Amino acid sequence: MDVKDGFYIDVGANDPIEMSVTKWFYDQGWHGINMEPSEEYFRKICEARPRDINLQQGAGKKRGQLKFYEIPETGLSTTDGETASRHRTAGFRVEEKEIEIVPLKDVCEAYAQEHEIHFLKVDVEGSESDVLTGMDFQRFRPWILVVEATLPNSTVLSVDWDPWVRSQDYDFTLFDGLNYYYVAKERAQAFGARLAVPANIFDGFVQASTVQLTQQRDALEQKLAQMTQTLEQMREEMKRCREECDETQMNDTGAFRLKGAILE
């Protein structure tokens, strides 16, 4: 998007770097709101996103307290009991705690009244419907909306909320295998074509994991080059020491012979 100083909202922000869909925006100078109830990931977000508004809360239909099923060190934590049960059966460790739930419209009322919302992402592992219906899309109009559209950790579609989103004057543009993408009708002419197809071979994109491996390789190669240089310097120093030692030994031998000749 050709937008400078843009504003985003990331509901279910999770890790601020790994697999984050808003990291690139932040790196370009954007800022926004991150909602993440997990203590582990909330700390990471606060450290990595000092310009953002970071809220350790969940989003839902109405204000209140809700049971949160946290699955440590994963992006699978959820407020949906059924989803948590499936993860527990699959062998994941599930920790339960109460968290504060706030409707997304209230969050926007408090923090986004003076901002044009350019991008809204919702990824809450099975509770997307509650988050979306807690938003006032007539008052607050994100240009682009991205919502996780499959059952957690699967490729099975789960989009019961889709008709409601479309009823809020949003056009569906594409499914990338994980998320549904929408554009506000009033922005369709500007952005609809750009979001007609997912990232593909013609984009020349590189997966984040490949970038990370490349960076790790480059760092190791640099370290190896430094170690090789140090080793070469040590070899040169050893050679110099040997030469000095040999010269000293020769001088000592010559002096000894001279002394012997004099004594004779």
Positions of predicted regions on the chain:
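Phosphate/nucleotide-binding beta-alpha loop and adjacent structural elements of enzyme active sites
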Residues: 1-264
